[in-house]
Amino acid sequence: DTLVRRKQICALYASSLKQKSWAILPLLSSADTESSYHLFALRIKGIQEEQRDRIMQKIFDQDVSVNVHFIPVPMMSFYKGLGYRISDYPVTLSLYENEISLPLFYDLTDDQVNTVIRALVNAVESEL
């Protein structure tokens, strides 16, 4: 089942990253809610966009693909044209600057998840 596998992958990411002081893990479940396990949107404490982009490049250089999924509305061209400025939304900007979405798909093997984790940790810790 796809959802079961996605939960397993998220659990692997979470268990491997929870002890990293720089990792801000996504909330996957609480007493009232549970994630759809569609994305694993990791945030890296204290970094800005330039650092995030360097980290992502270092991960790419290890043959792992990551992404940024949440582009703030004020950064979209239509809204820029309406006069919205990301500088008016500092919390949103901060969340955007330090977010990296890790691979999360049904066919991802445990070995591949471990490869992602190693690439991520190597990249982040070489940048901080």
Q: What do the PLM-derived regions correspond to, one by one?
A:
Residues 1-128:
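PLP-dependent aminotransferase class I/II
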